[in-house]
């Protein structure tokens, strides 16, 4: 049987992979967005694990709201990224400082 600690360890590992992805690759915006989404999904998995362990559906309902916001965030982020790529022909974070006023 899979216990709560197994889910929490897996969530912590996924969160750590997301943090490492942010710190190791600060050049590519797509990798940054994917790392942030991985961290958010790790937190969601912990919400669902605690919700199941405590026999409460509030955590699972909260996850649906978080996933909705995350989907909107990803869509807006990718739309901004496409617009920047069309103008600058690059998605490097270092090259995006041209946007400063």
Swiss-Prot record:
Enzyme Commission (EC) number: 7.1.1.-
Name of the coding gene: nuoK
GO BP annotations listed: ATP synthesis coupled electron transport
Keyword Protein transport: no
A molecular-function term among this protein's GO annotations: NADH:ubiquinone reductase (non-electrogenic) activity
The protein's name in its UniProt record: NADH-quinone oxidoreductase subunit K
Subunit description: NDH-1 is composed of 14 different subunits. Subunits NuoA, H, J, K, L, M, N constitute the membrane sector of the complex.
Function: NDH-1 shuttles electrons from NADH, via FMN and iron-sulfur (Fe-S) centers, to quinones in the respiratory chain. The immediate electron acceptor for the enzyme in this species is believed to be ubiquinone. Couples the redox reaction to proton translocation (for every two electrons transferred, four hydrogen ions are translocated across the cytoplasmic membrane), and thus conserves the redox energy in a proton gradient.
CC per GO annotation: NADH dehydrogenase complex; plasma membrane
Annotated family: Belongs to the complex I subunit 4L family.
Membrane-topology descriptor: Multi-pass membrane protein
Positions of transmembrane segments: 4-24, 30-50, 61-81
Species annotation: Nitrosomonas europaea (strain ATCC 19718 / CIP 103999 / KCTC 2705 / NBRC 14298)
Localization terms from the record: Cell inner membrane
Reactions that this protein is recorded to catalyse: a quinone + NADH + 5 H(+)(in) = a quinol + NAD(+) + 4 H(+)(out)
């Amino acid at each position: 049987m899979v216990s709560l600690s197994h889910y929490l360890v897996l969530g912590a590992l996924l969160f750590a992979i997301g943090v490492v992805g942010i710190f190791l690759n600060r050049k590519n915006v797509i990798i940054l967005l994917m790392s942030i989404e991985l961290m958010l999904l790790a937190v969601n998995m912990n919400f669902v694990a605690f919700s199941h362990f405590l026999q409460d559906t509030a955590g699972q309902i909260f996850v649906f709201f978080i996933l909705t916001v995350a989907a909107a965030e990803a869509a807006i982020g990718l739309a901004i990224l496409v617009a920047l790529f069309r103008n600058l022909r690059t998605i490097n974070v270092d090259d995006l400082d041209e946007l400063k006023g």
